[in-house]
């Protein structure tokens, strides 16, 4: 009798099929969790930017204009004597999808609007592609 110490081709195929099935079941759930984490990160960054904008307003007496943008939280706009920044420790963040946040002041929903266009980078959308905004908590 021969003493074979290896796996047969059938055994290897069965293991590969099981691994493939597990990956097919777990993979989409992992991707959804990653997108949920990005949405939560965008909401947290918008909250951080909102707090910095409120501090800017307390010092200067107004929010940065749309032209000055969020960069006014890092570098002093011309003609502002009471600017006491920088109001962010690091550079103005991009959204979790690598795109800049949209800032409007005055805003349509409050004194300012901050939004990310989500995963697809375009206005509107549903699910992972929906916009993340400062006015929707």
Give residue ranges: language-model regions.
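Short, intrinsically disordered low-complexity segments
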Residues: 1, 28-31, 39, 56
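N-terminal single-pass transmembrane signal-anchor helix
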Residues: 2-30
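Short, compositionally biased strand/turn segments
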Residues: 6, 71-72, 76
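A structural feature recognizing the 12-helix transmembrane core of secondary solute carriers
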Residues: 7, 29, 33-36, 43, ...
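Phosphate-coordinating loops and pocket residues in cytosolic domains that bind phosphorylated ligands
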Residues: 27, 32, 68, 75
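Short, surface-exposed interaction loops/tails
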Residues: 36-40, 47, 51-54, 60, ...
């Amino acid at each position: 009798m021969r003493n074979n110490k290896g796996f047969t081709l059938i055994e290897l195929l069965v293991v590969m099929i099981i691994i493939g099935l597990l990956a097919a079941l777990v993979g989409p759930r992992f991707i959804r969790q990653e997108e949920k984490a990005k949405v939560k990160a965008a909401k947290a960054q918008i909250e951080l930017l909102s707090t910095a904008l409120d501090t800017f307003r307390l010092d200067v007496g107004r929010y940065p204009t749309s032209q000055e943008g969020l960069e006014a939280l890092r570098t002093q706009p011309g003609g502002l004597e009471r600017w006491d920044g920088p109001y962010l420790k690091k550079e103005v963040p991009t959204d979790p999808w690598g795109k800049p946040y949209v800032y409007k002041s005055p805003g349509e929903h409050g004194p300012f609007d901050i939004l990310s266009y989500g995963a697809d980078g375009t206005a509107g959308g549903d699910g992972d592609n929906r916009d993340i905004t400062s006015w929707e908590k």
